[in-house]
Amino acid sequence: MNRNRKRVMSLLLTAAMVASATTPILAEEEKKYEVTETEWGYYLVTQDSGETLIYSPNSGVTLLEDDGYAFKDLNQNGVLDTYEDWRLDTETRATALAEMMVADGRDGIESIAGLMLYSAHTAVSSETVSGTELDSRSGTQDGTTTMDAIMTNKLRHVLVTTVASAEIAAKWNNNLQEIVEGMEYGIPCNNSSDPRHEASTDSSVQYVAGESGDISQWPGTLGLAATYDPELVQEFGNIVAIEYRALGITTALSPQIDLASEPRWSRVSGTFGENTALTIDLSRAIVDGYQSTYDEDGNDLGWGDESINAMIKHWPSGGPEEGGRDAHYGYGKYAVYPGNNFDKQILNFTEGALNLDGATEMTSAVMPYYTISYNQDPSGDNVGNGFSNYMINELLRTEYEFDGVVCTDWMITADASSDSVFEGKCWGVEDLTIAERIYTCLMAGVDQFGGNNTIEPVMEAYDIMVELQGQEFADSRFAESTVRLLTNIFNVGLFENPYLDVDESVATVGNAEFMEAGYEAQLKSVVMLKNSNNVISAYDETAEKLTVYVACYTETTTDATTLVTTTTTTPSVSVEVLSQYYNVTTNPEEADFAIIGMESPSTGSGYSTEDLEAGGNGYVPISLQYREYTADTARETSIASDPGAEFIDSDTGEIVYTDEVENRSYQSKSVTASNEYMLDVLEETREAMGDKPVIVYMRQTKATVWSEVEPLADAIIVGYSISDQAAAEIIAGVTEPSGLLPIQQPANMETVEAQDEDVPMDMECYVDADGNTYDVAFGLNWSGVIDDERVATYGSEA
């Protein structure tokens, strides 16, 4: 399936009731619309050469007529207001509603404040809206339910996490939309989601040709990059958009298009890798896939009922984190630019998602990252990107002409008490109040606040703006954000069609066609790094089944109460899927070859409270190897630092601060991977197998130092968030591998320390026993090193 696919469904119902008694009623023969009651209790309004409408009889909204056409009286005033007229363009409608809201005084400003909120994470476990509290993501909940946020705080943007099923999600959406349709202005909810299409590693979840599933299963973002196929990535975007719409989701909090120039960063797996040319093309392709609707002939219609808003992240790239530490915590707040490479870091945005090939032209929303882009603001202001006038107003909006929604990353306006506690991320403005931070964001060009559920601090920020800038400025600034926020709701047609046909949703999400496309993409994403003596070759159905030994991991736990010890043994790759191709044994002596599944070395976040308590600065290395690593060649002095250093008072045990400049260096400190046992099991497997082949399946989330692993393996495949089923099909030779590395694999940790966080593809790469270099765009097929058009296009471009 691609852009020329047939339209699979018409997701959105539309409905209407009888015409408003305050509006002149046309004779039946003059009407250009027809009203039909649906089985779900809504009214469908179909029109001659006009928009299809829906609304609920329970919302209080009725129909207005003009020139024989029907319109929803969303504010229930009996007048066809400009924003209710679907014949007008989005800009006109959004501007008219924004002006109306401002004209309504403080009540209208409160509604605008509600639009500026983006809810905390919300699980949809039932079709009712009033249930579970919104998750504050800080270990506690603030008591706010979805209903509270909608009714009291006028919130219209809900971040949906887990959903019980497509049926439950569709019913929940309809109930939610019915509630807000009856409220002031009748503004629909624009629901969103973080990525939810990564393949399940649960061996019980398998692809079966011709069968449907919960949702289509694709490789992770780094796996999509490994295909080096923009057309496939655009197809992925198309399918995600259709499935999201069927779940009531109209904004994707994705794609994550940061340039993965720092190999230790924990979020590398969510990126398109570190090849600049490739990431530009894939960023453009996926956003085109999200935002454009196509007709049966493959023509790009622009915004339509198969479109979702893309919120690209994270401006101006979260990739160059110093030492690989992530900015969700204060110890990772700084992005650094030792290679003076800021301009290349933003190319994915400026030449990619902000410069689309499709009819929507530009991404509809941008999320700045938590990081302080250290010393990049000419004014010398070092604050988080969401607070930075330079990053948003001067660069994004003025220089690169982006006039869409800018939404902060989650919880940047909340308080933070320590670098090591998961709380707010108010980096650089810790001394301000929550309201002052919101004001700072608004003045910097932000429109919306991720993870904020209540309007009170936004209204306080409005009052601050009135006091400091004047009433006219404050009203104009709030109206400006309102137009942007409403534009994204109008563009996807929610004012006319916010409801779902539940049966259509169930039939659409995870349908057989989408499942097949996702599974094929998984297969295309697998990278074969090593294949000595053609251990992996084409599958021969007529040959006698080989016998495989599957390495296992053993875990022993002791119950703290009963002191009972339990030992659990888990196969490193699903025995169920491997048994489709091989006889499986637990005895290495009986096996023809062995398989071991491994995961990237996991060495933590780069910060240790134990080190802090022991008198250190808390900073430790992030390693890409399993065995102990000592950072002898790390920087003696960190590039970025806080004006005050944090330490533990030995008398009180409390965190205190000094006035001396902080040094975040971890030089000479050591760290060992928490999953070092995987290397132990590989060594044991190698010894047990003797000269018989050992195949390593690496589930990679970021780069690996292969010197510990490669010499012990006869063949290596790498998967990026794929199913064991897809990995097994490649190993068995049912499908020939075609993936290419999207990130470099370092020769050692010394080259990792020497590389610049902001410069992609600047490491010495690992060379294996067969003489192959594990660089970007390297991969093997059955014939050897892949050298095709993809390699010619992207192989040498950093």
Predicted region positions:
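Bacterial N-terminal signal peptides that target proteins for export
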Residues: 1-11
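A periodicity- and composition-biased signal for non-globular, repetitive helical segments
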Residues: 11-13, 319
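Intrinsically disordered, low-complexity Ser/Thr/Pro-rich tracts
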Residues: 19-29
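Glycoside hydrolase catalytic-domain context in secreted enzymes
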Residues: 27-798
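N-terminal compositionally biased, intrinsically disordered segments and leader/signal-like regions
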Residues: 15, 23, 566-568
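Hydrophobic core
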Residues: 13-21, 534
